Structures are given as C-alpha cells and as structure tokens.
Regions:
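General structural signal for secondary-structure boundaries
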Residues: 2, 6, 36, 171, ...
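Alpha-helical lid/collar subdomain of P-loop NTPases
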Residues: 196-360
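Sequence-level detector for tyrosine residue identity
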Residues: 17, 26-28, 64, 85, ...
Length: 506
C-alpha cells in the first residue's frame, strides 16, 4: 500500500471507531478497536501523514517516539500504597500514570479536543526492558494500569528489519490484535503531494524523468547509502532559500540531503541544466509577454532542436511557473473573500455604535478569539497566519480613519468601502494577468513544439493540479479547452493500443 492509501485508511478508521449513536455513545466495540501498525521504510512520510489526518479530521494528535523513553516514563514510577485485605493491612506496589497517557489528558485539557490519535513511532525498536510494556500497550491499549482515554485511537509505526538492526519482531499473538499496514515508496503518489506542497520544480521534473531515483536504501560493507522522501523535501527548502539569498548551490550541498553519491551527482547536473534552461528559454519573460519576436524565435528554434529531456524540462518549467502564479492569485482571492466577510461583520457591529472608535473593540475581540484558537490548537500555523493578516488589515483601516480624523460611523464605513473597492480592482487586474499568462504558455508551446507530446504533458499537468483545474473551470481558458480534444484523443488512442496488445497476446 502506498502512503496516500494508508492515509485514507486511517481517516476511514477514525470515522468508524468514533461513530456515535443518537445518545452520543460510541457504537464501535472498544475491544474490537485494533490499533493500526504502519510498517514502512524510513523517511517515507508516516509521521507527516498523521499530522495531515489530524488536521483534516479536526481531531487531536499526541505523538511520541518511543525510543526516546525509558520504562519508567512509559509505564510510570512505582509507589508503595497500603491496602486492607481481609482485615489485614498490606503494603503493595502501584504505578503512577504513564507520562504518555498523562500527556493525552494534558492535551485534552489544553485544547478541549476529546478525540484524537495517539501516535507511537519506532514502536518495534524499543529496548528489551520496554518491549513487554509495548506488547501490553498494543494488546490491551494500556500503559501500566492506565488505559488510553476513550475517543482516542492508537496508531503505531515502525521500520522493517531490513532498515534497522534494532527492530524486534512481533509475535503472532500481538500481530493478531493489530491492523498491520505495509507501506512502500511510490514516486507518483509523492509527486502528487509534492506538487501541492510547492516542492522545488527541479526536483519535480527530475523525479518525473527518473522515478527510480526517488527512494533507495543500501546497507553495504562500505557503509549506509540512502535517498528518502524526507531528503527530497528538505532539499527543496534549502534550494529555495539559497536561491533567494543568491548562494551558490553545489554537489556537496545536495549530497548532504541525498546520501547516495551517484544520485546526488546526477541531480546536481540536472539542477544546473534546469537553471540554464530557465535562463536560455526566458520562461518568466515569455509568460509576461515581454519577449520581443526575435528572441522568441530564437527560443523556439532552440526548442525544436532540443533533446527529449530538454523539451520535457522546459515544459515542466512552464507548468511550474503557471501553477505558482495561479496559486498566488488564488491565495489573494481567498484573502479578499475573507476580508469581505470580516467587513460585513464590522459594518453590522459599527451600525450599533456612535463612533468608529468602537472599531478598536471589534479588532480586539478578533485578536482575543484568534489567541484562544491558537492556544487550543484549533488552527494550523498557516490558518493562524491568515487570521493574523486579516486582523492587521482591519487595524490598518482603523489607523487610516484616525489619520483622516473620521469619527462618524457612516463616513467611516464609506471610506473603508472605497479602500476595499481598490483592493478588488487590483484583484481583477491580477486575474486578467493570470489568464493572459496561461494563454501565453499555450502559445509558446504550440509555436515551439507544435501539437506534440509536450503540449499533452502540459495539458495533463494542468488537469491533474487542483489549483489549476479550479482556476480554469471558474475563469476559463480558450486554449485549454481547444487542446482538451488532444488529451481525450490521446487517452482513447492509448486504450485502443492496450486492447490491441491484449488481443495479440491472446
């Protein structure tokens, strides 16, 4: 199973385990709620998936790497208590609450979330003294004598023995009480995720060409060599940061993230070509429509003579640039929509007041609500940043009214309306620029490569990207719909070829 399917399986499990009847009672029998055990190679995204599931399902997440714990912190500390048995007082040993179980209750107190996921990573790499406690945890959902709170499901993760010498195999008794999901690296699934996350375009196009270099782990007499999904994602961040700082990027830097010399060297060479093609083909200038006809002809002539890899890379660069600009416009659009909703609430609030000075109370209440949401972990970092931006815009509007010495509510609302109108006009200009940019991309591909596989690749990329497909469905793109027939024809042609091959094999 790939990591995307595993994520969906966890989401479905949450829905099943946390289903309630009309009286608010959980319907799934607690004794049948098997913990999920994810077994897969390191760096494939198991921990990241848990964060995504918790955010999408709006439940809590408490994550622990069990190898960082001793038996005392996991099970609890022993304490002597006195009990009366048959009229005789006896000292016995009990245990304090496990640090892990206590952290779940602490999380519930702080956030108000009563349901969630307890995620235990590297569960099959525990020390010998902690191994029995882990088996008890998976079998009975308890640490020591304390149970995992109701409404919390258990997900554990570990690596196969081939990747870690510290791995302890679970016995059949334990495996018969969990839902074991084996996860494999899948380049296509990761590329889909990477496109949404804005991974560097050079990495996306390189792995589209050389999928076999996406993931590998070798343990030889010469040492350990590996390339993981985590490595590619971290490399993307450093590439973007160094490019902004105009710091030179060399093979040594890339080798720090891709710890397989041949792959690091190969990607370093591809990255240099990627940057050169971006400059030679003047991608940004073409999309902006700022290339004079002579330069455009030079770029097209260069593309017509190019190798398959170069043509593929140029197409991927165009797709990356288009996707990035559409994404920027959509974020702006979402910001304006949110601002419109806030201004409607502000207008209702001010109509009941005598002066626009009351706007300060409105802004203060919004900030207080935001602080409460952040404290309760009800917002992701990105959502919190968007809310903070909205509050700052409202504060700026308030300061502008004070600078103009406006205190009348009606006049203040009118001034804010004018400023919002200017924002909307700028948004419409950006929309037209984005639509024009999309048409420019199609025009260049047609002139440079004709209606060949490059155009098909570009069209397929736009269709497969949610941001691009939503933008095109909302605002249109004549060139896209014109070439949709090419995409459909190609799909039908491939289906016919497959049918022919099947018939010949029979």
């Amino acid at each position: 199973m790939n990591i995307k399917d595993a994520k969906n399986e966890i989401i479905h499990t949450l829905a099943a385990y946390l289903k309630k009847d009309g009286n608010g009672v959980y319907t799934y029998p607690l004794v049948r709620q098997r913990p999920i055990l994810l077994i897969g190679p390191p760096g494939i995204g198991k921990t990241a998936v848990m964060e995504q599931v918790a955010a999408e399902c709006k439940v809590g997440l408490v994550a622990y790497t069990i190898t960082h714990h001793t038996r005392q912190s996991a099970v609890g500390l022993p304490k002597i208590v006195t009990r009366n048995y048959g009229g005789t007082e006896t000292d016995i040993t009990e245990y304090t609450m496990s640090e892990i179980i206590a952290s779940v209750y602490e999380y519930m107190e702080q956030t108000g979330k009563k349901e969630g996921i307890l995620f235990i990573d590297e569960i099959n790499c525990v020390s010998e003294t902690l191994a029995p406690a882990m088996l008890q945890f998976l079998q009975n959902k308890t640490f020591g004598t304390h149970k995992v709170p109701q409404g919390w499901i258990i997900v554990a993760a570990g690596n196969p023995p081939a990747y870690n010498k510290s791995v302890r195999e679970f016995d059949i008794v334990t495996l018969d009480r969990v839902r074991k999901i084996s996860i494999q690296a899948d380049t296509d699934v990761w590329l889909e995720y990477a496109g949404e996350k804005g991974i560097h375009g050079a990495i996306l196009s390189y792995l589209s060409l050389k999928k076999e270099n996406f993931y590998m782990v070798e343990n030889t007499v010469d040492g350990k060599f590996f390339v993981t999904a985590r490595g590619w994602e971290d490399l993307s961040e450093i590439l973007k940061s160094y490019e902004e700082l105009q710091v030179e990027i060399g093979e040594e830097l890339i080798g720090e993230f891709l710890q397989k010399e041949e792959i690091a060297r190969d990607f370093a060479g591809y990255y240099r070509l990627y940057e050169k093609y971006k400059s030679d083909y003047q991608i940004q200038e073409i999309l902006d429509g700022n290339v004079i006809s002579g330069q455009l002809k030079t770029c097209c002539d260069m593309g017509k003579k190019a190798s398959f890899e170069e043509r593929f890379t140029v197409t991927e660069m165009l797709l990356e640039a288009v996707t990035e600009r559409i994404s920027v416009f959509q974020k702006t659009d979402e910001k304006i929509e949110k601002l419109y909703e806030n201004l409607k609430l502000l207008k209702i609030f001010l109509q009941e007041k005598n002066s626009v000075e009351a706007m300060e109370q409105f802004v203060a209440s919004r900030r207080k609500a935001l602080d409460a949401k952040i404290c309760s972990e009800l917002l992701t970092a990105e959502e919190a940043a968007r809310e903070e931006e909205q509050i700052r815009i409202l504060e700026e509007y308030f300061f502008q009214l004070k600078e103009l010495h406006i205190s009348d509510v009606a006049e203040g609302i009118e001034q804010i309306g004018e400023r919002f109108g200017n924002v909307c006009r700028l948004r419409n200009e950006k929309l037209e620029e984005t639509k024009k940019m999309l048409e420019q991309a199609f025009s260049f591909l047609e002139e440079c490569f004709g209606e060949g596989q490059e155009l098909l690749l570009f069209e397929t990329g736009l269709t497969g990207d949610d941001r691009c497909s939503i933008f095109i469905s909302q605002y249109g793109c004549p060139s896209y719909f014109k070439h949709c027939e090419l995409l459909l024809y190609s799909k039908k042609e491939n289906e016919l070829r497959k049918e022919c091959r099947d018939l010949l094999e029979e």
